[in-house]
Amino acid sequence: MKRNTIDIITLGCSKNLVDSEKLMRQLEANGYKVTHDSDKPQGEIAVINTCGFIGDAKEESINMILEFCQAKEEGKLKKLYVMGCLSERYLKELALEIPQVDKFYGKFNWNELLADLGKAYKSEFAIERTLTTPHHYAYLKISEGCARKCSYCAIPIITGRHISRPMEEIIDEVKLLVSEGVKEFQIIAQELTYYGVDLYKSQKLPELIERIANVPGVEWIRLHYAYPAHFPEELFRVMREHDNVCKYMDIALQHISDNMLNKMRRHVSKAETYELIEKFRREVPGIHLRTTLMVGHPGETEEDFEELKEFVKKVRFDRMGAFAYSEEEGTFAAKEYEDSISHEVKQQRLDELMALQQEIAGELSQTKIGKEFKVIIDRKEGDYYIGRTQFDSPEVDPEVLIKADEEYLKIGEFYKVKITAADDFDLYASIL
């Protein structure tokens, strides 16, 4: 047990990771040594930043809390604090059920946590953070909360209304990160396309991305978690005109059947969805689309599911994730619909959909053999350097593997490669 050391454990999404990184910087500014995501307690104090999005995430968070409670009982830890989405939503219940935790905090109560440690929040470090990612890329969160009211989603209940960060503050953070060696930015929010509506009374995502693209030293910008309804089409021009805005869009579509889109309260139709995809591919040639789909939402019939499969076959997404509906208390779906689709049927549909996507992904990967791409090197792993193209986001997308015995490559640098082989997800390449 190291004195004056705090372990930060982050669960859930990249937005949570940014929160942890900002907290880490505050703790370091207050004199602590901070470790991140260690397998076992190293310091006197641990802070677990939880996720509470769906059932599996809640279970993972609870298990991690209990694991650290055990470590505390064994004398390996003096203090245990819990924050984040799960804690925000179930603070009172958790405090009663798990008294071994010294204190539970909401998602945004950093000041309180620091005060309990006898420290103070330092506003001069507000846009600074301690990166936990490789030094060449960072996640850039442009807003908090969500203004949408999708039937199944508890995020607005947990995080509250959409709050855009001021544009100047974001640009200052980008410049600071570039000065520290960051070249690649993953732009994230619960819902990107709403950015600016609350603060500037209109959608400002295209303007923001263009301003980030114009910052010297920004080499790649990638956009995550867009919403299909009222998509700001000015963004197409920005993507076309700026080479450092990756031809990549992560847009959660959830379903295609009008029956399900209505039940999900998505405020977009099947026809509008197809039209938007067509516009993406027409206006931004070569764009790679990532989406997330949901199966098993209350009311999903076999016909709805077949329609979803046909959609996946027809559109042939470059990247796709999917998950099964999980009832979340307090949501519209939990109040108004019966969760009548069995776990077995949900899992069967999920497996079927992902098997279909795996086949499509494999076919799309094969078309890249013989082509040349610019890649950034993330790490060395065994006999390979691991890199990504502009079409691949860290953690969730395919990677490019380059034999390490070819030549010495620098982590965080760009190289031109030629694809020599492919499997269902990853590509193999040689340096040009």
Feature map (PLM): residue ranges:
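Proteins enriched for Cys/Gly/acidic motifs involved in redox and nucleic-acid/cofactor modification
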Residues: 1-195, 234, 249, 271-282, ...
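Conserved beta-strand core positions
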Residues: 6, 45-46, 138, 185, ...
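Conserved SAM/AdoMet-binding glycine-rich loop
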Residues: 79-84, 89, 94, 179-303, ...
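Glycine-centered loop/turn positions within well-structured domains
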Residues: 111, 148, 193, 258-259, ...
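Conserved, mostly hydrophobic/aromatic
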Residues: 170, 187, 223, 251, ...
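Active-site proximal loops enriched in glycine and acidic residues that flank catalytic Cys/His/Asp
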Residues: 189, 225, 253-255, 291-295, ...
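Terminal RNA-binding accessory module
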Residues: 333-432
